[in-house]
Amino acid sequence: MDQQRLTHLKQLEAESIHIIREVAAEFDNPVMMYSIGKDSSVMLHLTRKAFYPGKIPFPLLHVDTDWKFRDMITFRDTTAKKYGFDLIVHKNPEGLAAGINPFDHGSSKHTDIMKTQGLKQALNKYGFDAAFGGARRDEEKSRAKERVYSFRDKNHTWDPKNQRPELWRTYNGQINKGESIRVFPLSNWTELDIWQYIYLENIEIVPLYLADVRPVVQRDGMLIMVDDDRMKLREGEQIEHKSVRFRTLGCYPLTGAIESQANTLTEIIEEMLVATSSERQGRAIDHDQSGSMELKKRQGYF
């Protein structure tokens, strides 16, 4: 990796740390969304840098759908214990009581109830006025047009036509009671930037990002990993063991793996250099209807 690339990453790092510190100073009750993925791991690392040697001055929130990969939950709990940050785990109690799951209720309903409504419940319960997220503009077209400070009304909904100008590095955090801001410090990073930064900073990640032989089934054009005994096989489906890894992580029945032999960070970076598709190709929730992600964001999804 040449000096120019290092300089580029240091510029991104400085911008992100500036945004994180700005929010901590400007808002009364911020929170960081911690989804356990690679972007969350980078954002957590940047946050620890931003306030070092002090502790992170706000809690981390994980909205748990009860369908995350087991490796993700293990990694979450281990990381929280290692760094001693304040971790809030919220599950939608109504969704759990109703037995909402991606198999019987589909990706759209499952995501709305267990993620979107669960997130809104947690934000209301704790009264957070700003919430950090690890979304990047290169991931998906609706995210590409979202501001760093993304205004949300009292119902947590997003109106892409009602966004505030962001000139240079000046962000408008003025809100009325009940309104909030979603903040995206990694907006200008790319997937390749994330992986190179993870490599350079030696950031720990969930093992699922590295290739290994795993049990999978072919479903709807994706390789779905059989992560526990709740996996419901469709007629004709056969479990195969393939060398796969994940570019993105979510609920395991809705997240597709890719066939890969890349089991080191350098090999992942080499794959990224020739990749021609978005990592979100492996997320079923992005394809359950036309304009799916923008509709979800309008309803309160991250």
UniProtKB/Swiss-Prot annotation:
Annotated segments matching region Disordered: 280-302
EC class: transferase
Family matches, as InterPro entries: PAPS_reduct_dom, Rossmann-like_a/b/a_fold, SO4_adenylTrfase_ssu, Sulfate_adenylyltrnsfr_sub2
GO biological process, one term: hydrogen sulfide biosynthetic process
Key words of the record: ATP-binding, Nucleotide-binding, Nucleotidyltransferase, Transferase
Family from the record: Belongs to the PAPS reductase family. CysD subfamily.
Stated name of the protein: Sulfate adenylyltransferase subunit 2
Upper classification of the organism: Bacteria, Pseudomonadati, Pseudomonadota, Gammaproteobacteria, Vibrionales
Gene designation: cysD
